[in-house]
Amino acid sequence: MKTNAKFDRKEISKIYKNIARHHIDSFDFAMSTCLNRACEHMLPFDYIVPEESASCGFKKLTLWYDSFELGQPSLGEIDYDSHILYPSECRQRKMTYTIPLFATIFKKFDDEMVDNFKVKLGDIPTMGRKKFCNLKGLTKKELAKRGEDMLEFGGYFIVNGNEKVIRMLIVPKRNFPIAFKRSKFLERGKDFTDYGVQMRCVRDDFTAQTITLTYLSDGSVSLRLIYQKQEFLIPIILILKALKNCTDRQIYERIVKGNFNQRQISDRVEAILAVGKDLNIYDSDQSKALIGSRFRIVLAGITSETSDIDAGDLFLSKHICIHTDSYEAKFDTLILMIDKLYASVANEVELDNLDSVAMQDVLLGGHLYLQILSEKLFDCLHINLRARLNKELKRHNFDPMKFRDVLTNQKINCGIGLIGKRMENFLATGNLISRTNLDLMQTSGFCIIGDKLNNIRFLSHFRSIHRGQYFAEQKTTSVRKLLPESWGFICPVHTPDGAPCGLLNHISMSCVPIGSEEKQIDIDKFRNILGELGMNSISSDLCLNYHTGYYPVIFDGIHLGYVEKDIGESFVEGLRYLKCTQSQPDYAIPRTLEIAFIPFSGYSRNLQWPGIFLASTPARFTRPVKNLHYNCIEWISPLEQMNLSIACTDEDITPETTHQELDPINILSIVASVGVFAEYNQSPRNMYQCQMAKQTMGTPYHNHQFRTDNKIYRLLFPHRPIVKTRTQVDFDIEEYPSGTNAVVAVISYTGYDLEDAMIINKSSYERGFGHGVVYKSYTHDLNESNSQSTRGIKSSVRYKFLNNVSQKDKSKIKLENIDPDGLPKIGSQLTKGKPELCIFDTLKRGAKLSKFKDSEKARIETVRVCGNDDKNPDNLSIGYTIRYSRIPVIGDKFSSRHGQKGVLSVLWPQVDMPFTENGITPDLIINPHAFPSRMTMGMLIQSMAAKSGSLRGEFKTVETFQRYDDNDIVGHFGKELLDKGFNYHGNELMYSGIFGTPLKADIFIGVVYYQRLRHMVSDKSQARGTGPIDILTHQPVKGRKKGGGIRFGEMERDSLLAHGAAYCLNDRLFRSSDYSEGFVCQNCGSILSCYVNRAIMKTQTFIPPSLDESNKDTEDKEIHMNEKVICKVCKKNSNCKKVALPFVLRFLANELASMGIKLKFTVNDF
């Protein structure tokens, strides 16, 4: 394995070291190449002036996009008073990091000459660090000069000052026929079955359209597609006849492929042809006309001048097998799907697993961004502009001459400026507002905030991949299972426990989703290369067919030809040789070409549909392995991996082995591989560590003075771990430490260490162990105050930051923490109610103070004054960061790197701590019972290794699955300890800190890297006596900031019931919650119909108690005697009884009464 490790580091570490490479490549490729491809596929906008409208000098207007152009981020107009915009400025000013988008638009009036003009469509958000970012190509020093982290890798958008990441989603494999069963198909009609074959067809501009062939009980096939969120079912014969002029016999022979003896297939094909006979279609034009007549109502780009045949052509080219432009290729693809459907129905092949990675692709952020942008650009012309033109024609002051200057008139141009805002809204909310839904199964949850709690959490956002929000709502667990096909592509360890388990995964360390095309393949040249290797090209002559003993060759969803069964392996091996060696002089085959060979099983039933499947498109999972035949690195995909023999180690190599893993650790994600000696731990503990590593206080960044994150945790005195993994070095994780090396003794001491609690040495605590801070940033914009001005005053200089409080107010308010300019003083302390900002109102000539509302003490860390885009010096915004001290207190959580989580139970004086013969007292004590049930042997090994490293004065760089002499890792580090005069097993004689006598047992003591988690008592402590209550239920409101109550849930209730604490239960859930008194009618049992009638007799003299206290008892008694409780239903007052009841019960009775449901109560005396 040593040779493999060197081979790995030398050859490919640079390739996948960039954590967010797939995000950046996808965006750059989408914007630089595919945006103009989308432009070519967009239909022109044809506008025919209605006859009843006023004459405007023309009858028909045609507009279309010719090309798009993107600029660089800047402020101000191009070539006029502009300056370069950098991400750091956008963060501090809470702006969006955008680039200008320009379009060249052609227009034509009737038969006049074509004219063109260039227009700015708006500013769209851009991704940081690469092609469309001003940080591209900057060195570490230049990055630091621009206010960025020296190790900044980009891959995110900046929207309103926040870093947003478009998360990766799993989608069905593109341009590949997938056979499956779905019970929902049965609901479409009486003849429908649950068998289907679907293909997610994706065009070169990433536009997707899924078509599904469904098997009917009579043997025929129906094609299903969704267009603008509507489902359409079309007989397959109608599509086949429209794509190609052919006879029924030719279609019959192409599907049957010489198997005339199989009566079952023949009957099914005859059923397909019978549907065509019923529809009276015999040639291509008839089929197109029928399709066009049915779909012209819903198709975009159809005018009254468009014929049914042209509408049918438009439907076929834009919605059927859109990954290819040729009708011939579309026809062959549908025939191929019918073949697989019939084979699945006949049980000749197994159904495909939609949850397998082999049947999946990844939807990258840049590709999704392009799909949304393309749709918005299309809607701008075809929907927004059409509505605007219709509105202009109906204006009473319509001017025909101005109307010709279409798209140059700002009134007509208004729809275009919304493109940037819509893209910004998508990134800010993660919600997809789409006319077509982009062939996706969800409309929300696409974007997440790239929060920098620590560096590990931040980088994991770029490696996470989600199964889809649709599956999170399902009760089935099959989508969550870890399948063998995921080996090397999806990390088996790094997934959260709880609701998202198995749905939110992380790609492995070596997995690289392809974000861009390595090279665009010339299909004709590639067909010739395959022909030289032995492929027979598919013929346009439908009479020439190949029987089922041939392998079909499919390239990116296009059926190219067939290969004989006997030469299938040699054909694939020859193609793999050209891929690995790049020895083709005329035409180089992409290194990431997928060569998936599924051979015949040799039995009557195949596990998979046999064929040779080639793919070169982006958005595929790939990873590098070592090809043993050619001694080079080969990039493979999940479908390709299933039929390869890949050895993990040197000992696994057999004569049949073709490939070998570069490093066994490559199956783990970056976060999972950071854990040291993880292979010696119980598996769930490694899962817990992946989550806790992302909840640790540490060093989130190095450009602290330029960051304005809403909330940031920071450890004041972090250490580099003495024992670290090679992954931490390769990915620069060690530059952002998130823990402390602590001397840990495993001993039961004082009794405060039960149930995972831990004892911290008080002197270590005083030296700064675990000390941290929390930063919160706030922004105050004068524009917001200006917009709230009364009486329509819009003066931009009404409000100023100025400490101009009157002498009368100064005597009442302490302003020592506010500077003369009205801004907070850096370093000043803030307490609740203390002024933190002073704004002067120039209109009312008075000062307005903004007061600190938090109950916890804090200090001003930084203050930033930012200008506005209107270049008005008085139109400012102020940003300031507040620092909260977070020293460890009892109840705060700590954890090791092995999933051992515990809370601080007590700070124990150093004089009472146990000590070794060398006089070393531990920083931390944990109970020995933490290990047997958790089986985290890796933590014990780490303790020995770090102890050895500290004695030898060196860092220990280890790696998961690393081999040691005689496979004895304890012996390896034990000998190092023995050489330094310490015990072989890491035990030492310790003395009692209280009595000074030796302890009877040797104590295991060493050095462990401990992490402080963000779950702190200071953030969660909550208590109240009385406080705000809910208006409807009269129960205490929830929320710590609102002064709400503590949640008393079902488990708490059950515990009191089990203890029989009835009075305590009554006090907590009734008297201290929503206690109320009311009346219940004993006759009808209603608590809603009773009311109190206080009738004062005419002979009674009412004396207020406040005027005559001596008559208070008499007066109260008189009023009480005159109260009458009457039931409105029964009209009686003798049967109403006063009871104590929860107010929420009264609320429930009212709600049920509104639905016609009556609650009846019975009153008994106990």
Curated annotation (Swiss-Prot):
It is found in: Nucleus, Nucleolus. InterPro entries: DNA-dir_RNA_pol_su2, DNA-dir_RNAP_su2_dom, DNA-dir_RNAP_su2_hyb_sf, RNA_pol_bsu_CS, RNA_pol_bsu_protrusion, RNA_pol_Rpb2_2, RNA_pol_Rpb2_2_sf, RNA_pol_Rpb2_3. A zinc finger (C4-type) spans 1081-1130. Keywords: DNA-directed RNA polymerase, Metal-binding, Nucleotidyltransferase, Nucleus, Transcription, Transferase, Zinc, Zinc-finger. Gene3D superfamilies: 2.40.50.150, 3.90.1100.10, DNA-directed RNA polymerase, subunit 2, domain 6, RNA polymerase alpha subunit dimerisation domain, RNA polymerase Rpb2, domain 2. It is an enzyme of class 2 (transferase). GO terms for biological process: DNA-templated transcription. It catalyses: RNA(n) + a ribonucleoside 5'-triphosphate = RNA(n+1) + diphosphate. The keyword Metal-binding applies. The keyword DNA damage does not apply. Its EC number is 2.7.7.6. Belongs to the RNA polymerase beta chain family. Component of the RNA polymerase I (Pol I) complex consisting of at least 13 subunits. DNA-dependent RNA polymerase catalyzes the transcription of DNA into RNA using the four ribonucleoside triphosphates as substrates. Second largest core component of RNA polymerase I which synthesizes ribosomal RNA precursors. Proposed to contribute to the polymerase catalytic activity and forms the polymerase active center together with the largest subunit. Pol I is composed of mobile elements and RPA2 is part of the core element with the central large cleft and probably a clamp element that moves to open and close the cleft. This is DNA-directed RNA polymerase I subunit RPA2. It comes from Euplotoides octocarinatus.
